[in-house]
Amino acid sequence: PYVTLKWAQNTDGNIHGHISTPLTSMLVHRERARHDAILVGSGTVIADDPSLDNRLYAGSSPLRVVLDRRGRVPAGVRVFRDDNVVYYSEAERADLPSVVKTAVYDSLPGVLSDLYNRGVTSLLVEGGAEILKCFIDSGLYDAVRVEVSPAAVATPPVAPLLPKSPSWIEQLDGNTLYGF
């Protein structure tokens, strides 16, 4: 699939906490509507219990993809609310809702291949920091969208660093958007 990495951070590089504005949140949901699937790691699901759907823009919600190598994500999280989710883990999970599609996690290229075989041609990777760094270090991405807010965030995790310059920069609602 065509892989887009997306995250929001403050000027210190911290990505934890609420960073997006109402307008930039709507743009995130537009990106979700334009992608077949959205991927996050177990840390993001455990910390934020996100819905990973499209509520703020016209269009459908993407397939939700959760990478959880060690089987740490609780069975009652919002991403498991219906059958529009694929869960990758090295651990066996008998406690997940029966609607959740499960697959064995072997590698990022293996996950991308499996998603492609499921009909996914575009994937939005929203984090967290560890997952984003893995995609960057592996070179398994086609585009990157970064939102930077001047607002302070209390603690790490720290956003990954990209080894290239942005192809576009846009000021929007007090935040700066970068495209790579």
Map each language-model feature to its residues.
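Active-site ligand-binding patch in enzyme domains
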Residues: 2-122, 130-133
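Beta-strand secondary-structure signal
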Residues: 4, 124, 177-179
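Glycine-centered flexibility sites
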Residues: 13, 41, 127-128, 139, ...
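Short Gly/Pro-enriched turn/cap motifs at secondary-structure boundaries
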Residues: 18-19, 125, 168-171
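Active-site lining segments that contact anionic ligands and/or coordinate catalytic metals
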Residues: 62, 120-122, 141-143, 175-177
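Conserved histidine-centered catalytic loops in small-molecule metabolism enzymes
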Residues: 108, 156-180
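Flexible, gly/pro- and Lys/Arg-enriched active-site loops
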Residues: 136-167
